[in-house]
Amino acid sequence: MNYYDALYPQLVAMGQERWAAQLQSTLSKQLLLERYGDMPEWLSALEALPQIQPSCIDLQDSVTIGSGSDLGRISSEELITLLQAFHPWRKGPYSLFGVEIETEWRSDWKWDRLLPHIQPLAGRRVLDVGCGNGYHGWRMRGVGADFVLGIEPFLVSVMQFQVMQRYLRDPQHQVIPIGVEDLPANLACFDSVFSMGVLYHRRSPLDHILELKGCLRPGGQLILETLIVEGDQETVFMPPGRYAKMRNVWFLPSIPAMTLWLQRCGFTEIACVNTNRTSHGEQHATDWMRFESLADYLDPDDESKTIEGHPAPLRAIFIATRP
Protein backbone atom coordinates (compact mmCIF):
# COMPACT_ATOMS: atom_id res chain seq x y z
CA MET A 1 0.00 0.00 0.00
CA ASN A 2 1.28 3.46 -0.89
CA TYR A 3 -0.04 5.93 1.65
CA TYR A 4 0.67 8.89 -0.62
CA ASP A 5 -1.16 8.01 -3.83
CA ALA A 6 -3.79 10.65 -3.04
CA LEU A 7 -1.13 13.33 -2.49
CA TYR A 8 0.34 13.54 -5.96
CA PRO A 9 -2.82 14.66 -7.81
CA GLN A 10 -3.26 17.39 -5.19
CA LEU A 11 0.22 18.74 -5.89
CA VAL A 12 -0.29 18.53 -9.65
CA ALA A 13 -3.51 20.53 -9.28
CA MET A 14 -1.45 23.19 -7.48
CA GLY A 15 1.00 23.39 -10.38
CA GLN A 16 3.67 21.33 -8.59
CA GLU A 17 4.19 18.52 -11.11
CA ARG A 18 7.95 18.40 -10.62
CA TRP A 19 7.66 18.21 -6.83
CA ALA A 20 5.02 15.48 -7.11
CA ALA A 21 7.35 13.40 -9.29
CA GLN A 22 10.22 13.94 -6.86
CA LEU A 23 8.13 12.86 -3.87
CA GLN A 24 6.96 9.70 -5.63
CA SER A 25 10.58 8.60 -5.50
CA THR A 26 11.57 9.86 -2.04
CA LEU A 27 8.40 8.55 -0.36
CA SER A 28 8.57 5.04 -1.79
CA LYS A 29 7.81 2.32 0.74
CA GLN A 30 11.10 0.56 0.07
CA LEU A 31 13.12 3.72 0.74
CA LEU A 32 11.26 4.35 3.99
CA LEU A 33 11.88 0.75 5.09
CA GLU A 34 15.59 1.21 4.43
CA ARG A 35 15.73 4.55 6.25
CA TYR A 36 13.81 3.68 9.43
CA GLY A 37 14.59 0.57 11.46
CA ASP A 38 11.27 0.68 13.34
CA MET A 39 9.22 0.96 10.16
CA PRO A 40 8.32 -2.78 9.88
CA GLU A 41 7.00 -2.82 13.47
CA TRP A 42 4.91 0.29 12.87
CA LEU A 43 3.53 -1.07 9.61
CA SER A 44 2.56 -4.32 11.33
CA ALA A 45 0.83 -2.42 14.13
CA LEU A 46 -0.97 -0.25 11.60
CA GLU A 47 -2.20 -3.22 9.59
CA ALA A 48 -3.32 -4.96 12.81
CA LEU A 49 -5.70 -2.13 13.67
CA PRO A 50 -9.33 -3.23 13.36
CA GLN A 51 -11.20 -2.32 10.22
CA ILE A 52 -14.13 -0.36 11.60
CA GLN A 53 -16.40 2.25 10.09
CA PRO A 54 -16.74 5.10 12.62
CA SER A 55 -20.34 5.96 13.44
CA CYS A 56 -19.46 9.61 14.06
CA ILE A 57 -16.63 12.03 13.34
CA ASP A 58 -15.96 15.43 14.90
CA LEU A 59 -13.05 17.55 13.69
CA GLN A 60 -14.51 20.94 14.55
CA ASP A 61 -14.61 20.89 18.35
CA SER A 62 -12.12 18.05 18.89
CA VAL A 63 -10.64 15.11 17.02
CA THR A 64 -13.18 12.41 17.82
CA ILE A 65 -13.47 9.31 15.65
CA GLY A 66 -16.27 6.86 16.36
CA SER A 67 -17.55 5.66 19.72
CA GLY A 68 -16.91 2.70 21.97
CA SER A 69 -19.98 0.90 20.65
CA ASP A 70 -18.34 0.74 17.20
CA LEU A 71 -15.71 -1.71 18.47
CA GLY A 72 -18.05 -4.70 18.53
CA ARG A 73 -16.14 -7.80 19.59
CA ILE A 74 -12.87 -5.90 19.93
CA SER A 75 -12.10 -4.70 23.44
CA SER A 76 -10.82 -1.22 24.17
CA GLU A 77 -7.83 -2.87 25.90
CA GLU A 78 -6.88 -4.58 22.63
CA LEU A 79 -7.10 -1.26 20.80
CA ILE A 80 -5.00 0.48 23.46
CA THR A 81 -2.29 -2.16 23.11
CA LEU A 82 -2.14 -1.61 19.35
CA LEU A 83 -2.06 2.18 19.72
CA GLN A 84 0.71 2.02 22.33
CA ALA A 85 2.99 0.59 19.63
CA PHE A 86 3.22 4.17 18.38
CA HIS A 87 4.43 5.62 21.71
CA PRO A 88 5.23 8.45 22.43
CA TRP A 89 2.04 10.34 21.60
CA ARG A 90 2.99 14.01 21.94
CA LYS A 91 0.28 16.02 20.13
CA GLY A 92 -3.46 15.66 20.67
CA PRO A 93 -5.73 14.74 22.40
CA TYR A 94 -7.61 12.17 20.34
CA SER A 95 -10.71 10.12 21.02
CA LEU A 96 -10.66 6.94 18.95
CA PHE A 97 -13.61 4.56 19.35
CA GLY A 98 -13.98 5.56 22.98
CA VAL A 99 -10.26 5.31 23.77
CA GLU A 100 -9.07 8.67 25.09
CA ILE A 101 -5.48 9.25 23.96
CA GLU A 102 -4.15 11.71 26.53
CA THR A 103 -1.12 13.12 24.77
CA GLU A 104 1.78 15.05 26.29
CA TRP A 105 0.53 18.34 24.85
CA ARG A 106 -2.96 19.80 24.94
CA SER A 107 -2.61 20.94 21.35
CA ASP A 108 -6.27 21.95 21.37
CA TRP A 109 -5.42 24.77 23.79
CA LYS A 110 -2.97 26.27 21.30
CA TRP A 111 -5.57 25.88 18.56
CA ASP A 112 -8.14 27.76 20.62
CA ARG A 113 -5.64 30.57 21.24
CA LEU A 114 -4.75 31.12 17.60
CA LEU A 115 -7.99 30.44 15.72
CA PRO A 116 -9.74 33.78 16.46
CA HIS A 117 -6.77 35.75 15.10
CA ILE A 118 -5.98 34.14 11.75
CA GLN A 119 -7.56 34.52 8.34
CA PRO A 120 -10.43 32.00 7.97
CA LEU A 121 -9.08 28.72 6.65
CA ALA A 122 -12.20 27.73 4.71
CA GLY A 123 -11.26 26.92 1.12
CA ARG A 124 -7.54 27.48 1.70
CA ARG A 125 -4.51 25.36 0.89
CA VAL A 126 -2.42 25.04 4.03
CA LEU A 127 1.15 23.95 4.77
CA ASP A 128 1.90 22.90 8.36
CA VAL A 129 5.66 22.76 8.97
CA GLY A 130 6.76 20.46 11.80
CA CYS A 131 3.20 19.24 12.16
CA GLY A 132 3.84 16.29 14.48
CA ASN A 133 1.10 13.71 14.05
CA GLY A 134 -1.17 16.11 12.19
CA TYR A 135 -3.48 17.05 15.06
CA HIS A 136 -3.76 20.69 14.02
CA GLY A 137 -4.22 19.63 10.40
CA TRP A 138 -7.36 17.71 11.38
CA ARG A 139 -8.62 20.81 13.16
CA MET A 140 -7.87 22.86 10.04
CA ARG A 141 -9.95 20.46 7.99
CA GLY A 142 -12.66 20.77 10.62
CA VAL A 143 -12.97 24.50 9.92
CA GLY A 144 -13.05 23.99 6.16
CA ALA A 145 -9.47 24.08 4.86
CA ASP A 146 -9.52 22.72 1.30
CA PHE A 147 -6.18 20.91 1.53
CA VAL A 148 -3.66 20.51 4.35
CA LEU A 149 -0.13 19.25 3.82
CA GLY A 150 1.90 18.57 6.94
CA ILE A 151 5.62 17.91 6.91
CA GLU A 152 7.24 16.11 9.83
CA PRO A 153 10.72 14.51 9.96
CA PHE A 154 9.95 12.10 12.84
CA LEU A 155 8.39 9.00 11.36
CA VAL A 156 6.64 7.79 14.51
CA SER A 157 4.53 10.97 14.36
CA VAL A 158 3.79 10.36 10.68
CA MET A 159 2.65 6.84 11.53
CA GLN A 160 0.37 8.21 14.26
CA PHE A 161 -1.20 10.33 11.54
CA GLN A 162 -1.71 7.19 9.47
CA VAL A 163 -3.55 5.61 12.42
CA MET A 164 -6.17 8.37 12.24
CA GLN A 165 -6.14 8.40 8.45
CA ARG A 166 -7.02 4.68 8.47
CA TYR A 167 -10.44 5.65 9.79
CA LEU A 168 -10.93 9.18 8.46
CA ARG A 169 -9.78 8.37 4.90
CA ASP A 170 -9.35 12.03 4.02
CA PRO A 171 -7.32 12.59 0.82
CA GLN A 172 -7.36 16.35 1.52
CA HIS A 173 -5.06 15.96 4.53
CA GLN A 174 -1.61 14.47 4.08
CA VAL A 175 1.47 14.26 6.34
CA ILE A 176 4.80 13.35 4.76
CA PRO A 177 8.14 12.47 6.43
CA ILE A 178 10.35 15.32 5.27
CA GLY A 179 11.88 18.40 6.89
CA VAL A 180 11.49 22.03 5.88
CA GLU A 181 14.95 21.91 4.31
CA ASP A 182 13.60 19.30 1.87
CA LEU A 183 10.95 21.63 0.46
CA PRO A 184 11.59 23.05 -3.02
CA ALA A 185 12.45 26.74 -2.97
CA ASN A 186 9.77 29.32 -3.74
CA LEU A 187 6.74 27.05 -4.03
CA ALA A 188 4.49 30.12 -3.70
CA CYS A 189 1.35 27.98 -3.74
CA PHE A 190 -0.05 27.89 -0.19
CA ASP A 191 -2.64 30.31 1.18
CA SER A 192 -1.59 29.77 4.81
CA VAL A 193 1.66 28.44 6.24
CA PHE A 194 1.98 27.35 9.86
CA SER A 195 5.29 26.95 11.69
CA MET A 196 4.69 26.21 15.36
CA GLY A 197 7.47 25.16 17.71
CA VAL A 198 10.10 25.02 14.96
CA LEU A 199 11.92 28.37 14.75
CA TYR A 200 13.97 27.98 17.92
CA HIS A 201 15.30 24.65 16.65
CA ARG A 202 16.77 26.29 13.53
CA ARG A 203 20.38 27.48 13.55
CA SER A 204 19.43 30.24 11.11
CA PRO A 205 16.01 31.63 12.07
CA LEU A 206 15.98 34.20 9.27
CA ASP A 207 16.58 31.51 6.67
CA HIS A 208 13.67 29.57 8.15
CA ILE A 209 11.40 32.61 7.91
CA LEU A 210 12.44 33.11 4.29
CA GLU A 211 11.76 29.43 3.53
CA LEU A 212 8.27 29.84 4.94
CA LYS A 213 7.74 33.02 2.94
CA GLY A 214 8.74 31.19 -0.23
CA CYS A 215 5.97 28.65 0.33
CA LEU A 216 3.26 31.34 0.48
CA ARG A 217 1.45 32.85 -2.46
CA PRO A 218 1.38 36.66 -2.54
CA GLY A 219 -1.23 37.75 0.00
CA GLY A 220 -0.88 34.49 1.93
CA GLN A 221 -0.61 34.42 5.70
CA LEU A 222 2.15 33.09 7.93
CA ILE A 223 1.21 31.80 11.39
CA LEU A 224 4.37 31.38 13.45
CA GLU A 225 4.59 30.24 17.06
CA THR A 226 7.90 30.24 18.90
CA LEU A 227 9.58 30.56 22.26
CA ILE A 228 10.35 34.15 23.20
CA VAL A 229 11.97 36.16 25.98
CA GLU A 230 11.02 39.52 27.39
CA GLY A 231 12.96 42.52 26.14
CA ASP A 232 13.34 45.20 23.49
CA GLN A 233 14.16 45.08 19.79
CA GLU A 234 17.79 44.24 20.51
CA THR A 235 17.01 41.33 22.87
CA VAL A 236 17.67 37.83 21.55
CA PHE A 237 18.64 35.02 23.93
CA MET A 238 20.96 32.25 22.79
CA PRO A 239 21.34 29.54 25.45
CA PRO A 240 25.01 28.77 26.18
CA GLY A 241 24.12 25.08 26.38
CA ARG A 242 20.86 23.25 26.93
CA TYR A 243 17.51 24.98 27.33
CA ALA A 244 14.85 23.02 29.27
CA LYS A 245 17.10 19.99 28.70
CA MET A 246 16.94 20.50 24.92
CA ARG A 247 20.26 20.65 23.10
CA ASN A 248 18.91 22.05 19.85
CA VAL A 249 17.55 25.43 20.98
CA TRP A 250 19.31 28.34 19.29
CA PHE A 251 17.59 31.73 19.30
CA LEU A 252 14.77 33.07 21.48
CA PRO A 253 13.83 36.60 20.38
CA SER A 254 11.78 39.20 22.18
CA ILE A 255 8.48 40.22 20.59
CA PRO A 256 10.02 43.43 19.13
CA ALA A 257 13.01 41.48 17.80
CA MET A 258 10.78 38.83 16.21
CA THR A 259 8.69 41.59 14.65
CA LEU A 260 11.87 43.12 13.22
CA TRP A 261 12.96 39.75 11.80
CA LEU A 262 9.64 39.39 10.01
CA GLN A 263 9.89 42.95 8.69
CA ARG A 264 13.43 42.41 7.40
CA CYS A 265 12.26 39.23 5.68
CA GLY A 266 9.69 41.24 3.77
CA PHE A 267 6.46 40.50 5.63
CA THR A 268 3.71 43.04 6.25
CA GLU A 269 0.67 43.18 8.57
CA ILE A 270 2.77 41.72 11.38
CA ALA A 271 1.17 41.19 14.78
CA CYS A 272 1.84 39.21 17.92
CA VAL A 273 -1.64 37.92 18.74
CA ASN A 274 -0.97 35.79 21.82
CA THR A 275 1.60 35.06 24.50
CA ASN A 276 1.35 32.12 26.86
CA ARG A 277 3.55 30.67 29.57
CA THR A 278 3.53 26.88 29.26
CA SER A 279 1.71 25.24 32.17
CA HIS A 280 1.75 21.72 33.58
CA GLY A 281 -1.84 21.36 32.41
CA GLU A 282 -0.78 21.99 28.82
CA GLN A 283 2.37 19.84 28.81
CA HIS A 284 2.83 16.80 31.03
CA ALA A 285 3.78 13.12 31.01
CA THR A 286 0.92 10.65 30.59
CA ASP A 287 0.39 6.93 30.01
CA TRP A 288 0.66 7.76 26.31
CA MET A 289 3.95 9.71 26.69
CA ARG A 290 6.02 8.19 29.46
CA PHE A 291 9.23 10.18 29.00
CA GLU A 292 10.25 13.39 30.76
CA SER A 293 8.06 16.45 30.28
CA LEU A 294 7.69 20.02 31.55
CA ALA A 295 7.89 19.12 35.25
CA ASP A 296 11.37 17.73 34.62
CA TYR A 297 12.50 20.76 32.62
CA LEU A 298 11.80 23.44 35.24
CA ASP A 299 13.67 24.39 38.41
CA PRO A 300 11.76 22.53 41.17
CA ASP A 301 12.31 25.46 43.54
CA ASP A 302 11.47 28.24 41.08
CA GLU A 303 9.22 27.42 38.12
CA SER A 304 9.90 30.80 36.55
CA LYS A 305 13.22 29.26 35.48
CA THR A 306 14.29 26.19 33.55
CA ILE A 307 16.41 23.53 35.23
CA GLU A 308 19.45 25.38 33.83
CA GLY A 309 18.36 28.71 35.31
CA HIS A 310 17.07 30.30 32.09
CA PRO A 311 13.65 32.00 31.76
CA ALA A 312 10.89 29.37 31.71
CA PRO A 313 9.19 28.66 28.37
CA LEU A 314 7.11 31.58 27.14
CA ARG A 315 5.45 31.19 23.75
CA ALA A 316 4.11 33.77 21.33
CA ILE A 317 2.00 33.48 18.18
CA PHE A 318 2.74 35.88 15.31
CA ILE A 319 0.80 36.44 12.13
CA ALA A 320 2.19 38.14 9.03
CA THR A 321 1.36 38.53 5.35
CA ARG A 322 3.50 37.96 2.29
CA PRO A 323 2.92 41.05 0.13
Swiss-Prot record:
Residues reported in the UniProt entry to bind carboxy-S-adenosyl-L-methionine: 91, 105, 110, 130, 180-181, 196, 200, 315
Top-tier EC class: transferase
Keyword line: Transferase, tRNA processing
GO MF entries: methyltransferase activity; transferase activity, transferring alkyl or aryl (other than methyl) groups
Reactions this protein catalyses: carboxy-S-adenosyl-L-methionine + 5-hydroxyuridine(34) in tRNA = 5-carboxymethoxyuridine(34) in tRNA + S-adenosyl-L-homocysteine + H(+)
Protein EC: 2.5.1.-
Gene Ontology biological process terms in this record: tRNA wobble uridine modification
Oligomer and partners: Homotetramer.
Similarity comment: family membership: Belongs to the class I-like SAM-binding methyltransferase superfamily. CmoB family.
Role according to the record: Catalyzes carboxymethyl transfer from carboxy-S-adenosyl-L-methionine (Cx-SAM) to 5-hydroxyuridine (ho5U) to form 5-carboxymethoxyuridine (cmo5U) at position 34 in tRNAs.
NCBIfam families named in the record: PRK15068.1 (NF011650), tRNA 5-methoxyuridine(34)/uridine 5-oxyacetic acid(34) synthase CmoB (TIGR00452)
Name by which UniProt lists this protein: tRNA U34 carboxymethyltransferase
Species annotation: Trichlorobacter lovleyi (strain ATCC BAA-1151 / DSM 17278 / SZ)
Classification lineage: Bacteria, Pseudomonadati, Thermodesulfobacteriota, Desulfuromonadia, Geobacterales
